[in-house]
Swiss-Prot record:
It comes from the Eukaryota. The gene is abcD3. It holds the Pfam family ABC_membrane_2. Belongs to the ABC transporter superfamily. ABCD family. Peroxisomal fatty acyl CoA transporter (TC 3.A.1.203) subfamily. This is ABC transporter D family member 3. Keywords: ATP-binding, Coiled coil, Membrane, Nucleotide-binding, Transmembrane, Transmembrane helix, Transport.
Amino acid sequence: MKKNNVNNITETLNSSSSSSSSSGSSSDEEVKSKLNFNQTDEMLKKIKENKFDWALFKRFIKIVIILYEKPVIPLLLFLLLFGSGVSQTYISKFTGILLSNIYGSLTSGDKFLFVSSLIKGCFAIGGSALFDAIIKFIVSIMAWNWRKTLCLYIQNVYFKKSLFYKILAFDDRIDNPDQRITSDIDNFTTLLSSIVSQCITGPMVVVYYTYLCYTTIDWYAPLIVYGYFFLGYFINKLVMSPMVSINYLQDKLEGDFRYLHQRIRNFSESIALYNLSKEKQQKKSTTSVDNLDYYDDDHHYHHHHDDGEESDEYTDKTKIINRKNKNSKNKRSALLKRSNKNIKNEELLVEEEQAKQQFEALLKNKKRVIFWQFGLNTTSDMFTFFSPLINYFIISIPVFFLSSKAALEPAQVTVQSYNCIMLASGFSQYINVSQSISDLSGYISRISTMIEVCKKVMGDTSLDIEITKLNEKDKTKSLPNSLIINNRDTSINTDFRHISLNEGESITLDDVTYFTPKGTQLYEKISICIKKGNNLLIMGPSGSGKSSLIRIINGLWPFFKGSINRPENEDMFFLPQQPYLIFGTLEEQILYPFSKKQKRIPKSIMRELFQRFDIDYLLDRERFIKKSAQVNDLTHNWLNQLSPGEQQLIAIIRLIYHKPKFALMDESTSSIPQSLEERVYSVAKELGITIISVGHRISLLKYHSTLLRFDKDKNWYLEDIINQNNQSNNINTINIDNNTNKIAEDSVFD
């Protein structure tokens, strides 16, 4: 059964990416591209591993240990839940007695007994309802507390030492970590608290009413109920086990579908602009068909001849022309149909087509979930609804099937029936729990995988760079001679890699060799010294590894040979091409990565900073927004309200405010005018900020004293820039060929 289930899941992946071809088959590459499954085989392997077994239970225990890491509040809630369950179970006993008294008073006509039973019943049922509400309240608080504990635990690990970046950049074992931290944890804790509630009250009901059934009926009563529901449990177990894998896949598909729409929201303007040109091309495709050269009736060769032979020749030519005319019309009709079909297909945006394919895969698997859930619900409900018949069968045994046959009093029938029904209801809770466990198992797998991968990445020394602060006694420090990149197709042995910290006077790279996260070597043996006050410009083709070198210097990416000596993190500041703006006020944008709790900026300084770069109108706009109460500070999203140039200027003001000794700017002025760009470098020079820039503009040369140039052949060139009246740039080039170690001088720019 499990094997067929995995095959069905594989069919879901394949069918969702199948084309309209007659064979109906698709390659693995099509599956990966259309569903964005970069690791389809790996995912199927994970699905096969996620089954309801002992390994899953051990994963669950590890999560429970986290939930009870601070045990006082969880244990207190557990005891309150247990006490409320005991009270509700005890009160329910009187409900059966009251029903017996009411039934007896009606058959005997005892009005006083009837009224007193009703009054007592109000108290009993009211108390039972009150404790039921208390139990639900405790369950909600328990879920809230567990979510708080688990989410904060995972977030603490996820954000520690930029672990989130390592996972997203270097590891593909976790899909949609945002979904796992947000919705998966919420759903898991809600389900778990509900299951715990049923597992606490269920045993109490079973134990208590087992005793009552034994004392009021005989030993066979609880034995029959036990056997009946153990049979139901094993049948449900067979149906439930395959659902773990299906639910795991469903959670992944839901996350991928949500992520796709999140990307559409983030890039809505770009998508709309790209598709404007697409509409024009569609219009051209319709007009091109109308320009086809073909014959019609007006182009027939008409000429009147009296001669019979000439008339016959005319008739033959007319037939040929008509035949060509007919073929042309058929051809034009076919082209029109094909064009209309293409236009119809092109009406869908690429994003819409992707969303459609993702949604079809989601719906296909959801249909399987529904069918399997139907089977589980059927078996569960069957055992629940048949329990009254089992109850009456048990009561009938002493009446019809034992040697000492004796009729039962009506009051006895009521009490015995109620006790059997309550015992059956206790077991029914376990049957109902099995439905929740199938959903819970998927969340256990996803959350535990998140925790396991975070811990493994934290312990993976191949992604770490040892950073030490040098002093006069200790100028160097060696690392092990063999370090291997994990999770790569190829292993890369490293001889020496090290980042040492100085007092902020220079950044030095000594024989640094670095690779992409996929293991492709970019450049080797880069040696360069950037002293304070000497700006460095890095130029080269797109994708040549310019930004990668910035990541290496920052310590985000590992490098595998050489050493780096640089200032401490507090003396360095990084500006990406796409600025990062948080939800908050403009003051919070400038303070980032600090918060208002740590620092504040006076309004006069804020105004001066923004005026310096001609965007002080943003402060007035923010004041208007606050005054009109359109949005609160916490959720204010400036990213959607500012142009790319304004966003880059905000990031530059952030840099100017923090005044680091070194700034690493990755095309951070690409969206602002050259006049403002000149002002940026001028202000940075006034404040003593040494800049390492990545860029393509020739205008950047005059703000730097050294050029590090990359080419497409993985060679690097270190060049001195000589500015003459800021009009021209003469560059004395030192050409270092990594293959021949040949040193030559030439000129790059005229």
